[in-house]
């Protein structure tokens, strides 16, 4: 008998949570577990066509902020009969400021209630601290509602559930083979972007939002570009800060050097086109993009606050303090002033020479989606 779950956490932007969900549902046996998706967006969500092809229903609610009364009315009506339709609800969370999905699931007798943390901090706390206080209050109440707690990393679990909470770590696993270095994909994307084979291309994959620190990324690239005026940057993603970023790019005179792609569903080819991956996030749960970049055998330069649970290809994994500033980041990336454990960082090559297939290392580190999906499937089906 097929078990049916209600999934939350999908948005119109194909970010890390969305990537985790898609990696999971693509590898779970549909004859055992199927999913529907509860969303608060009028727009088409990421991967919606693929989800519908899998047989999923997309339950669209009126926006909570735009139409609060209509949202509440439709929301309550939907949950009233949800206990009869669903075997469980799987809530993907960035904070506990709002736990309505958990409380309404409990109230309406959905049997299995799962909370999965994908975040290790939240700079989105409002100035009055209301969201933070709500998060802390709900954290103390969580065991009244959620049957099972998952987290993408220990840091994400401690932030969401508390340091003494009983949670299980499920890594944001990927299809490692799909991200293995491919010269063919590299050539294809570079041709598409009109970037020559011997141009040094830096890049990142992430939303244009405060958490991902896009303004700092641009500042780092500005320093890199001063040293190498022929280099380019590709920012794969979209978000609310895009207009601000494009304005700043213009002010720096980097319109021809810094490219923003917008939202992309399949990012695998873009990693192949890059020569180095820059990732100065303010905080992360466990970033899928960093796992994907390592799977592509890219040199990765990242914030020193990101959990070492993400370290897979050690020789490509370089942490740099954010407070060092953009110039220090650029110098480290260029190999002028390595800060990684006192060792000089290797200079980033101009051409992708020696890129390897590191898929077995990704799998050995516990980031193989086949293994992770099987583990989750067992829980969702058997409990």
Predicted regions and their residues:
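Carbohydrate-associated surface elements
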Residues: 155, 173
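Short hydrophobic beta-strand element within catalytic cores of glycosyltransferases
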Residues: 38, 290, 299-304, 309
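A conserved mid-protein helix/loop that constitutes part of the nucleotide-sugar donor-binding site
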Residues: 15-23, 200, 204-223, 240-246
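N-terminal strand-loop element at the rim of the active site
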Residues: 3, 7-15, 19-70, 240-242, ...
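Aromatic "clamp/platform" in nucleotide-sugar-dependent glycosyltransferases that forms part
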Residues: 94, 263, 282
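A short helix/loop element that forms part of the nucleotide-sugar donor recognition site in Leloir-type
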Residues: 74-77, 180-195
């Amino acid at each position: 008998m097929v078990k049916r779950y209600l999934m939350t956490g999908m948005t119109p932007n194909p970010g890390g949570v969305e990537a985790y969900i898609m990696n999971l549902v693509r590898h779970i046996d549909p004859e055992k577990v199927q999913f529907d998706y509860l969303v608060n967006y009028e727009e088409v969500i990421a991967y919606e066509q693929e989800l519908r092809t899998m047989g999923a229903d997309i339950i669209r609610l009126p926006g909570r902020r735009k139409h609060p009364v209509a949202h509440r009315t439709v929301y309550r009506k939907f949950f009233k009969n949800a206990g009869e339709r669903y075997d469980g609800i799987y809530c993907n969370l960035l904070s506990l400021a709002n736990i309505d999905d958990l409380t309404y699931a409990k109230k309406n007798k959905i049997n299995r209630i799962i909370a999965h943390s994908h975040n290790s901090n939240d700079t989105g706390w409002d100035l009055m601290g209301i969201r933070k206080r709500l998060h802390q209050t709900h954290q103390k109440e969580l065991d009244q509602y959620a049957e099972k707690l998952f987290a993408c990393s220990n840091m994400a679990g401690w932030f969401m559930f508390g340091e003494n909470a009983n949670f299980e770590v499920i890594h944001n696993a990927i299809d490692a083979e799909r991200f293995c270095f491919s010269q063919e994909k590299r050539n294809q994307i570079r041709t598409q972007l009109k970037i020559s084979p011997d141009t040094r291309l830096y890049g990142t994959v992430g939303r244009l939002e405060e958490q991902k620190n896009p303004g700092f990324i641009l500042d780092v690239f500005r320093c890199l570009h001063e040293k190498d005026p022929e280099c380019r940057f590709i920012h794969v993603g979209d978000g609310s800060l895009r207009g601000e970023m494009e304005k700043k790019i213009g002010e720096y005179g980097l319109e021809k050097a810094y490219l923003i792609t917008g939202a992309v569903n399949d990012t695998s080819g873009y990693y192949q086109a890059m020569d180095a991956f820059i990732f100065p996030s303010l905080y992360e749960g466990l970033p899928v993009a960093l796992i994907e970049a390592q799977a592509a055998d890219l040199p990765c330069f990242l914030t020193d606050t990101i959990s070492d649970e993400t370290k897979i290809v050690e020789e490509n994994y370089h942490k740099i303090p954010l407070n060092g500033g953009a110039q220090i980041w650029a110098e480290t990336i260029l190999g002028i002033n390595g800060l990684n454990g006192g060792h000089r960082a290797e200079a980033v090559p101009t051409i992708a020479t020696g890129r390897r297939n590191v898929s077995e290392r990704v799998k050995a580190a516990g980031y193989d989606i086949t293994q992770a999906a099987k583990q989750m499937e067992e829980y969702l089906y058997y409990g």
